[in-house]
């Protein structure tokens, strides 16, 4: 009986990927962790420090130092860009495929027709570039925070329209388009005009709502991510189900990863609540895989708010200490990220960064896991840990973990 926890601190990268000068020059020099610690050198994250955060970062920009007891590595992104949805699919064993890129303007006609046919009131807003405005409460257009052309947003005022109805609109859009992701989200706004006032265009081809400016994150935020072309049958939850091991997803990962046979805690944003649920699930199940996402760090990155990012990291760190304290000798923990979102880089998009892979189990001897070429190595390790069939992608590093008393 054992538990394996993967905690994903959303967007907590540790340095730009080597290929950014070619594929994402706007991310050159990005380092989410490093630049936060440079601006706040006295920030203390003692649990992450012990687990090897500074080891993974590769230098000490503040008071925190490398750990002599850590098992750590870094992982490169195999998916293009830097994306939460594809990052988590990759973590859980999907081999990423090149995404379809298409501005919303290229599909606006058929999306509009499908919505009108389904009985929704649809207007076009904008001049040469246009987005859709549905039932005076929902905007549909390009996602301006992710890689342009890969994601469409449905931004709703949930004071006017129910989230269930917003999801119905999102599903109609999903049926009409082939981009990697459609995100339906909203918040409780006093005036729908706030969404319209946050409309922006980029590069003369993309138009949508600036999500942080819309106010959707501020009060009553809810979100569902609708993916394209991801096969849940080759992912970790399915493989563990075949081996009789339950999967628990907590936070944003539950919104974006299919888990039909397990427990999914969806529509959660508050970091403390997410960590409380994680610890409760950990204490409830003698055997389980638990994957938790901390989204508020990513939201702080989008808002380019270093102080907020650091404060959320402290919440995570305090609760990680509780989790480590509750662990038994057979339990394993991995702390990692899915991409970067450097709040100092000068734009509000994700940044393409390598991520830390920090591993803890009682009795473990300090080990360097090196550079993993895909996030899927974590999912492959989870499957081997539980003696389950491997996922589609990734190489397990379980055999690299060393413990006191091991013989060569």
Swiss-Prot record:
InterPro entries membership: Alkaline_phosphatase_core_sf, DeoB, Metalloenzyme, Phosphopentomutase_DeoB_cap_sf
Keywords: Manganese, Metal-binding
Cofactor note: Binds 1 or 2 manganese ions.
Keyword set includes Metal-binding: yes
Molecular function GO labels: magnesium ion binding; phosphopentomutase activity
GO biological-process terms attached to the record: metabolic compound salvage; nucleotide metabolic process
Family, per entry: Belongs to the phosphopentomutase family.
Superkingdom classification of source: Bacteria
Chain positions recorded as Mn(2+) binding sites: 10, 302, 338-339, 350
Cofactor(s) in the UniProt record: Mn(2+)
GO cellular component: cytosol
CDD domains assigned: PPM (cd16009)
Protein name: Uncharacterized protein YhfW
């Amino acid at each position: 009986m054992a538990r394996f926890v993967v905690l994903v601190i959303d967007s907590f990268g540790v340095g730009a990927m080597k290929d950014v000068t070619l594929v994402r020059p706007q991310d050159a020099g990005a380092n989410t962790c490093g630049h936060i610690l440079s601006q706040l050198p006295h920030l203390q994250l003692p649990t992450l420090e012990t687990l090897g955060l500074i080891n993974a970062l590769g230098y000490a920009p503040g008071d925190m130092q490398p750990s002599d007891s850590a098992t750590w590595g870094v992982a490169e992104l195999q998916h293009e860009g830097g994306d939460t949805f594809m990052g988590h699919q990759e973590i859980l064993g999907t081999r990423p495929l090149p995404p379809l890129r298409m501005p919303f303007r290229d599909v606006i006609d058929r999306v509009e027709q499908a919505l009108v046919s389904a009985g929704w009131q649809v207007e076009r807003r904008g001049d040469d570039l246009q987005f859709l405005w549905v039932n005076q409460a929902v905007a549909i257009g390009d996602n301006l925070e992710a890689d342009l052309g890969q994601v469409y947003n449905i931004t709703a005022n949930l004071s006017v329209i129910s989230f269930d109805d917003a999801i119905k609109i999102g599903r109609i859009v999903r049926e009409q388009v082939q981009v990697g992701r459609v995100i339906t989200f909203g918040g409780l706004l006093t005036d729908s005009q706030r969404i319209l006032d946050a409309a922006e265009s980029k590069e003369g081809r993309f138009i949508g709502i600036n999500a942080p400016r819309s106010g959707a994150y501020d009060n009553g935020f809810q979100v569902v991510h609708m993916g394209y072309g991801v096969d849940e049958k080759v992912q970790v939850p399915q493989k563990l189900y075949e081996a009789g091991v339950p999967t628990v997803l907590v936070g944003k990962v539950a919104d974006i990863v299919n888990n039909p046979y397990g427990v999914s805690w969806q529509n959660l944003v508050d970091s403390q609540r997410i960590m409380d649920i994680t610890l409760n699930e950990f204490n409830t199940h003698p055997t389980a895989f638990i994957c938790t996402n901390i989204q508020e760090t990513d939201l702080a990155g989008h808002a380019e708010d270093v102080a907020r990012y650091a404060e959320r990291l402290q919440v995570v760190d305090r609760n990680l200490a509780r989790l480590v304290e509750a662990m038994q000798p057979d339990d394993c923990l991995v702390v990692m990220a899915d991409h970067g979102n450097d709040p100092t880089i000068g734009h509000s998009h994700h940044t393409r960064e390598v991520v830390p892979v920090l591993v803890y189990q009682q009795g473990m001897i300090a080990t360097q896991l090196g550079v993993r070429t895909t996030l899927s190595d974590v999912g492959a390790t989870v499957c081997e840990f539980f003696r389950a069939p491997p996922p589609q992608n990734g190489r397990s590093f379980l055999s690299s973990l060393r413990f006191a008393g091991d013989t060569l």
